[in-house]
Amino acid sequence: MISLEDIRRDYLLGGLDLDQLDASPIAQFETWMAQAIESQIPDPTAMVLATANKDGFPSQRIVLLKKLDEQGFVFFTNYGSRKAQEIAEQSHVSLHFPWHMMERQVSVGGVASKISYAETLKYFVSRPKDSQIAAWASAQSKPISSRQLLLQQFNAIKTKFANGEVPLPDFWGGYRVVPQRMEFWQGGGARLHDRFVYEREGNSWAINRLAP
């Protein structure tokens, strides 16, 4: 079995203090996201989405953050997917942004719900046409016999909509995660990392430092 216990490194890129934080976790996240984009780290909008079914059994996958606003975090998916089915059963979810190259991570706990048709449509029409076609071609999370069959379905849809716009599927759309708790983590020397948690208190947020 491969040995893992000696794989480690020091965290040297700097600390995080309370007076550096915005009063709003959304504003603080926007600052960190802008810095992640500017740093040209790979896939800065990639986030781990954790859901659970009605029995509490969890699942995770990486999805892309496609919109950030004052209300929360928006992603898109097939409504028949496992994640969508689990959100329908139990709407509490968790997001995680692992920005390893910046020695940072952000965790978000909140409630997911579908966004409006108009909001979904606005995003869908902005997608590349092949991505629009892929939304139609894939019955996400369902068993499929081969990749060849998937490509056949894709090509059939592509032919169908070759001379016109691709309509928005009624089985595809967006979710917004409204945060109730957000944690910002900055790596520190000697494993003395800096952690700050925002917790919603009515219309405001309480901020506390956590032990690493």
From Swiss-Prot:
Keyword RNA-binding set for record: no
SUPFAM superfamilies associated with the record: FMN-binding split barrel
GO biological process terms, semicolon-separated: pyridoxine biosynthetic process
Stated name of the protein: Pyridoxine/pyridoxamine 5'-phosphate oxidase
Binding site for substrate: 8-11, 66, 123, 127, 131, 191-193
EC assignment: 1.4.3.5
Residues that hold FMN according to the record: 61-66, 76-77, 82-83, 105, 140-141, 185, 195
A single MF term (Gene Ontology): FMN binding
PANTHER family: PYRIDOXINE-5'-PHOSPHATE OXIDASE, PYRIDOXINE-5-PHOSPHATE OXIDASE
NCBIfam families: pdxH (TIGR00558), PRK05679.1 (NF004231)
InterPro entries, per the entry: Pyridox_Oxase, Pyridox_Oxase_CS, Pyridox_Oxase_N, Pyridoxamine_oxidase_dimer_C, Split_barrel_FMN-bd
Cofactor binding, per record: Binds 1 FMN per subunit.
Job of this protein: Catalyzes the oxidation of either pyridoxine 5'-phosphate (PNP) or pyridoxamine 5'-phosphate (PMP) into pyridoxal 5'-phosphate (PLP).
Cofactor(s) the protein needs: FMN
Family as reported in the entry's similarity comment: Belongs to the pyridoxamine 5'-phosphate oxidase family.
Subunit structure: Homodimer.
Superkingdom, taxonomy of origin: Bacteria
Catalysed reactions, semicolon-separated: pyridoxamine 5'-phosphate + O2 + H2O = pyridoxal 5'-phosphate + H2O2 + NH4(+); pyridoxine 5'-phosphate + O2 = pyridoxal 5'-phosphate + H2O2
A matching Pfam family: PNPOx_N
